Design a protein with these regions (language model features):
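A Rossmann-like FAD-binding core segment of flavoenzymes
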Residues: 36-142
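Short catalytic/ligand-binding loop motif for oxyanion handling, primarily in non-cytosolic enzymes
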Residues: 29-30, 58, 129-131, 189-191
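Residues forming the flavin
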Residues: 6-8, 12-22, 28-31, 96-99, ...
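Cofactor-binding loop segments of dinucleotide-utilizing enzymes, especially the Rossmann-like FAD-
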Residues: 24, 52, 185
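Glycine-rich dinucleotide-binding loop and its adjacent helix/turn
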Residues: 1-39, 47, 144-154, 165-169
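Mid-domain beta-loop-alpha active-site segment that forms a flexible
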Residues: 24-34, 73, 77, 195, ...
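Short, surface-exposed loop/helix-turn segments at secondary-structure junctions
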Residues: 133-161
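A conserved FAD-binding loop/helix module that cradles the flavin
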Residues: 39, 167-201
Length: 201
């Protein structure tokens, strides 16, 4: 679903409370920065960021040298918030249990570390809604849910937004369905590497 609107419609659920954000992509970064902004005007708001990996270097982007200036600025702002103590960062964190109680949630992480929070914002990935296409014979990569020929070109394990090579219509094709193509962000399936600029090349 959409990112939580912590500065708008969801403000009442998180203002003055402890919020755990899980994930290390752009959705997590934007949610964290919105919560930091909220915390500046809503005393008692506490922000914790949990990531599975040992490092968040990739989430910080390339700063001023980033090929995508907006991504570099997003990462620089996030790094600054963590370094200033506005966001508590937990690396190597995997949630093993969540228990609801009267005043919030108890989240157990690997190593039996417990956090007491009021809300969790899960920003751990997304997938395209392919229900409309269920009756078609699509050739999709099982991990990315993107066209089979496109998947290796956009795999986030090997590419970021700036390293995806230009590709043509052939990579979007589904041989069993001649003339059928999924285009735009949905064509990238679960990969967060979609850029309009790549489509114009």
């Amino acid at each position: 679903g959409p990112l939580p609107d912590v500065l708008g419609v969801n403000r009442g659920r998180v203002a003055g409370r402890h919020v755990l954000v899980v994930g290390s992509g752009h959705s997590a970064a934007n949610t964290l920065l919105s919560l930091v902004e909220l915390a500046r005007t809503a005393p008692g708001t506490r922000v914790t960021w949990a990531v599975r990996g040992a490092s968040v270097t990739r989430a910080y982007g390339g700063g001023d040298a980033d090929g995508l200036p907006a991504r570099g600025m997003l990462g620089a702002r996030l790094r600054s918030a963590v370094e200033a103590g506005e966001v508590e960062l937990l690396t190597g964190a995997t949630i093993t249990r969540i228990a609801r109680h009267d005043d919030g949630l108890t989240v157990t992480l690997t190593g039996e570390r417990e956090l007491h929070v009021h809300a969790i914002a899960g920003a751990t990935g997304f997938r395209p809604d392919l229900d409309l296409l269920r009756e078609l014979r699509l050739e999709l990569d099982p991990a990315l849910e993107a066209p089979r020929l496109l998947a290796p070109l956009i795999d986030p394990e090997h590419h970021s937004c700036g390293t995806v090579p230009a590709h043509g219509a052939d990579t979007l094709a589904h041989p069993a369905e001649p003339g059928f193509f999924v285009v735009g962000a949905k064509s990238y399936g679960r990969a967060p590497t979609f850029l309009l600029a790549t489509g114009y090349e």
